[in-house]
Curated annotation (Swiss-Prot):
Keywords: Actin-binding, Cytoplasm, Cytoskeleton, Kelch repeat, Repeat. This is Spermatocyte protein spe-26. The gene is spe-26. The keyword Cytoplasm applies. One of its GO terms (biological process) is proteasome-mediated ubiquitin-dependent protein catabolic process. Coiled coil: none annotated. Changing S360N: In IT112ts; causes sterility at 25 degrees Celsius. It comes from the Eukaryota. It is found in: Cytoplasm, Cytoskeleton. The keyword Phosphoprotein does not apply. Testis, in both spermatogonial cells and spermatocytes. May play a role in the spermatocyte cytoskeleton, possibly interacting with actin. GO terms for molecular function: actin binding; ubiquitin-like ligase-substrate adaptor activity.
Amino acid sequence: MRFCNSKLTSIDNRCDVAIISKDEERFEVKLVESEIARELNRLGALSPRSMQKNILVPFTTQTVKYLLGLEKVSDSTDEMGWFGIEKSLEEIAGFGQHCFPKILEMKNTICDHILSTLSDVNCFLLHKKFREFDCQNHAHKTLEYILYNLARMVVVDKRVDVEFYRLPVEEVKHLLSSEEVNVEQETQIIEVINQWIAADFENRDKFRPMLMSTVRFLALDQQIAKSLSQFHPSLKPARRTRDVLIIIGGWLHRQACDRIEWFDPENNCWKVSQQKLPTTLAYHGSAIVDGILYLFGGSTGQRTRCETWKLSTETWQWDRCNNMMEPRNYISNSSVVYDGRIYVFGGQNFREITRTAVRSRTGEVFDPKTNKWTETASLSDMRSDCAAEVFENQIYVSGGFNGDMILASVEVYNPIGNVFSRTVDLPYPITGHCLLNHGNQLLIVGGFDGAERQNKIWMWHRTGEWQQRPEKLIYGRSTSAACSYKGWLFSVAGYTEKVEATCEILLPEPNASRFSFIPDVPRAKSALNVLVAPNWRNFLERRGTINEQSMEMDDDYEDDAGASYMSINN
């Protein structure tokens, strides 16, 4: 029997009918009340046993339940449930077209649920399934994941979906030829080729010249390039870095700003994005989780904020999330991401009613999956302008200002036990500093000790003490930002004796990228955030940049009005 409307008779949309599944289970529906029922009526066949009542559809009972909303796709989490979901997707894939919008919606819902499980161990399988069922948008997302993570999965972690080793050589070549493949070094492409060939060396070694033609000759050092010349590597330009540094907000020209700037490592320059923040902000927190940028707290210059925003790189629209539990200012360096959740500690809470500013000892955590902030255990000390970082599965919170004095204390938060404990104090009290994990070392960078801004770098040693590194910043700076990027420690902008535009790089790791210097940021600023944005290059390039020369230029001057309390009062 063909499953299409036979048009042998007309069923009034106001009448009750029954949808009959392939398993012969009956579902009473009112066509006038259900768009999906009307779609099933259009594609189903009238039962010859009851021409006025029964509509036979080409779907199993489980699929009909999903379509009629009797069961939720998201409730299927066990092995049998996943089998049923895949079966339902197979059944409705051919009908999930624009002429059946509700069925198409269910097809996308099922694909979304399947995509939520995307990981290193199933990415190739999911990509194959999405292509098989003509789910183009979801196939594109799995391909994006594969291209970004391929070298890491195969070369670094050595843990990848077994379907990778089953790919035909043409697909392997297509993947490795892409501009979007994310590599730290081009030699990783060679190792990916070696691993795929090794899975069936006897039959695949003959494909080596074909695959080696995807290696970018210009991205190899001279010795390696010479050894591979027999394979005729590609003369295309080196692949561009997928991860970029972004600067979020900050104090600019005596006021908070709404700018996003990003660093282009291939051209060694900073660019100003067309994308703006939802409001002007400084001394705020920001984080990227699963590719989404979150923005929270801080100050507009007139008011301490508690709002949380998120930015979709598909629509470039800011959406409001659940507010923080309390307004928090001076949290530029005291928020971190751990296990997919955002933690923030301390800060200053300005009380609108009493018109007083109170330093905070509280902490809170935001879960993007539930869109909620919840309390954490409290710090022992009140502190704003402190710094936090994840190190060895714990969160270190150091230094800061309690409203009366600068602190040297360090507290360690255990996210699993939700408890703080004290550890060894810093060598001296410090605030407005940076704390970061670079090269698997926990480092204190810069800051203000109450008398002068520091250019020293201190390293936490596992013997239980802070040790000074011989390397130093060129400028002592506070209320700056720092991060680990492409094997270097980056120190960006901040406050010296004036607001800075300069950037410094130091402490290169063995395989660090080659930078001779890092140019100044487009405008001097402090109280900013700097983040490594994984796989954001394409997003930012598509969004577009602003030509700085065409922007209104203000006179340069010392911008001490935007410095933190400890920066301008000591």
